[in-house]
Amino acid sequence: MSICIKDQIQNMNIVIGCTVGCTYCYARNNVKRWHMIDDFADPEFFPGKLKMMEKKRPQNFLLTGMSDLSGWKPEWRDEVFAKIRENPQHQFLFLTKRPDLLDFDTDLENAWFGVTVTRKAELWRIDALRKNVRAKHYHVTFEPLFDDPGTVDLSGINWIVVGTMTGAQSRKIHTEPEWAWPLADQAHKLGIPVFMKEDLAPIIGDENMIQEMPEEFNKVLEVQKSWKK
């Protein structure tokens, strides 16, 4: 049985709102439905949520489930990074679709910076990530994958995630197996772990799913198990 990535990585929505404007954005729909903020296109910072980082039980956190890192104000980013440094027991992930708008250096050992790539025309984002975000760890999320990305330069990347369209739109378009498999092969040749999201199981078969996590994330999950005993 495939693993749900949400069981391995917890959302911490410190910033809500995004200026990118993707037509298929689930976050915008959720914000509108639950009235989280007044205007999704005007991101808001919720520093009170930083207290969640103080818990001693290790956790893998995604900090951009309801935002894009490119839309964070520099002072928000600085405050979050300072808190991350104080809590090395956790691993933290960030995602952006606009790495061209970022420009910073960080030596954080437990922060992972990634880009979303949905089609071949967006492969430039990987190069922009490596150029504009000088960091210890990089990841790429190919989700939802709309076409065959072909040969991808994954040098310096530490993890890739592959997924398909979900929700009502999944009836119109989905990721093809012949797009996903070459990505996994390219990553494995470089020793990069691959995680196929659970929504791919009906497309490629549950028995064919590859669901690998970076060793740093696995260590967090192992410690979590010991805390439950």
Segments the model singles out, each with a brief description of its role:
Residues 67, 98-100, 117-119, 144-146, ...:
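Active-site-proximal loop/turn and secondary-structure-junction residues that shape catalytic pockets
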Residues 61-63, 92-94, 113-115, 138-142, ...:
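Hydrophobic faces of well-ordered beta-strands that scaffold small-molecule active sites
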Residues 79-82, 129-137, 174-186:
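Long, well-ordered alpha-helical scaffolding segments within enzyme catalytic domains
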Residues 1-112, 120-134, 149-154:
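Conserved Radical SAM active-site core
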Residues 1-9, 146, 151-229:
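Auxiliary Fe-S-binding modules of radical SAM enzymes
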Residues 118, 122, 173-176:
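Short capping loops/turns at secondary-structure boundaries
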Residues 86-92, 134-137, 184-194:
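Structural alpha-beta junctions
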